[in-house]
């Protein structure tokens, strides 16, 4: 028989740098999960993606066991890295902070495709372009 799911916890943690300190500790502690076991397993799984923020979905079961699924980094993080900027623009329509090529957009869209609500790469590219525009990043050919 399948285990009963008690909670699904979603967090965004830097790859390979999870610690029992907030936000991880309190989020998992309230469900009685072994925090150190999660931290150790998460850091092992994400060690090769150092420097990126990795969203993770943790499913907590009735017997206090857990499973987790890592997702692809947020589109905004990938765009910031591609444009070589620290943060997006506070006034995206007035002040542009960087440029990204369509080829880079396609690369990001292909990486994010499995996590996006899109059927093909073209639709995913349009979503990523929209994110870029809202951050004040110019999309050039």
Curated annotation (Swiss-Prot):
The keyword Amino-acid biosynthesis does not apply. One of its GO terms (cellular component) is cytosolic large ribosomal subunit. Keywords: Methylation, Ribonucleoprotein, Ribosomal protein, RNA-binding, rRNA-binding. GO terms for biological process: translation. PROSITE patterns: RIBOSOMAL_L11. Pfam families: Ribosomal_L11, Ribosomal_L11_N. One or more lysine residues are methylated. InterPro entries: Ribosomal_uL11, Ribosomal_uL11_bac-typ, Ribosomal_uL11_C, Ribosomal_uL11_C_sf, Ribosomal_uL11_CS, Ribosomal_uL11_N, Ribosomal_uL11_N_sf. The keyword rRNA-binding applies. GO terms for molecular function: large ribosomal subunit rRNA binding; structural constituent of ribosome. Belongs to the universal ribosomal protein uL11 family. HAMAP family: Ribosomal_uL11. Part of the ribosomal stalk of the 50S ribosomal subunit. Interacts with L10 and the large rRNA to form the base of the stalk. L10 forms an elongated spine to which L12 dimers bind in a sequential fashion forming a multimeric L10(L12)X complex. This is Large ribosomal subunit protein uL11.
